[in-house]
A protein has these predicted regions:
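Flexible glycine-rich beta->alpha loop in the catalytic core of nucleotide-sugar glycosyltransferases
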Residues: 137-138, 185, 192-193
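Gly/Ser/Thr-rich beta-alpha loop segments that engage phosphate groups in nucleotides
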Residues: 113, 137, 143, 171-172, ...
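Conserved N-terminal beta1-alpha1 strand-loop-helix module at the mouth
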Residues: 1-95, 102-130, 156, 162-163, ...
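Flexible, gly/pro- and Lys/Arg-enriched active-site loops
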Residues: 92-98, 137-160
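Active-site phosphate/pyrophosphate-handling residues
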Residues: 78, 152, 188
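Preference for short coil/turn "hinge" residues that link or interrupt alpha-helices
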Residues: 130, 142, 164, 186-187
Length: 216
């Protein structure tokens, strides 16, 4: 199968996968979410004692490729040299981004987590990154390393740039409308999909809400 050559990301539903929690059932949930319209998958840098990192990443790439969905690596950029993954998500600004891009040797998607720090937004703009993500907008057990982000911060970032903005942390279909006025383009979620009885329905619901925002 050919690699995805479309190294862009525009918004939508962005699934963050915890590799330490993957089971056979997890892959089925991911497949159902892909069928319902994921825009990207990120492999979170939470490996615990797992050593077969490249194998897991490539399995996810193989799962996502038929749907044209890119797979991004959180922090462990070396895995892009061992797999067909499509990009990197940084937790913090890197002084070595130009060297990393050169070492990988192909077009990649790059994104970064922002908290309440507009300097990180400016860094993403200066480095011509493809998207930014704000964490955490609501309380979340999986985003407990993030500070809570004020809606005004996201709105300020929207005024600074047109690159896609995602929000993460405790987002559900019920509370997503509360943060839509900030101008975000997508949501990054873990448990809302991975712990759902019907991940396809959850993905569809998120996409429907985001699409309604675009038409208003």
């Amino acid at each position: 199968m050919e690699m995805i050559t479309n190294t862009t990301i525009r918004g939508g539903v962005y699934l963050v996968v915890d590799p330490s929690a993957l089971t056979d059932g997890s892959y089925q949930k991911i497949r159902l979410a892909l069928k319902s319209g994921l825009s990207a998958i990120q492999v979170w840098n939470h490996w615990q004692h797992i050593t077969a990192k490249a194998e897991i990443v490539q399995t996810l790439v193989d799962l996502a490729q038929p749907f044209g969905v890119p797979v991004l690596i959180n922090e462990n950029w070396e895995l892009l040299m061992e797999t067909e993954a499509n990009g990197i998500h940084f937790d913090l600004p890197s002084d070595n981004l130009a060297l990393i891009r050169k070492a990988i040797g192909r077009n990649i998607i790059t994104g970064i987590t922002c908290e309440n720090n507009l300097e990180t937004v400016q860094y993403a703009i200066d480095q011509k990154m493809d998207y930014i993500s704000f964490c955490s907008v609501f309380p979340s057990g999986s985003a407990n390393s993030c500070e809570w982000v004020k809606p005004a911060t996201i709105a300020a970032a929207r005024a600074m740039t047109n690159i896609p903005i995602f929000a993460a942390g405790g987002i559900t279909a019920s509370n997503l409308p509360e943060i839509l006025p900030t101008g975000l383009d997508g949501v990054a979620v873990i448990n809302s999909i991975m712990k759902a009885e019907d991940p396809a329905a959850v993905t569809t619901a998120f996409n429907k809400i985001l699409q309604q925002q675009k038409t208003h």
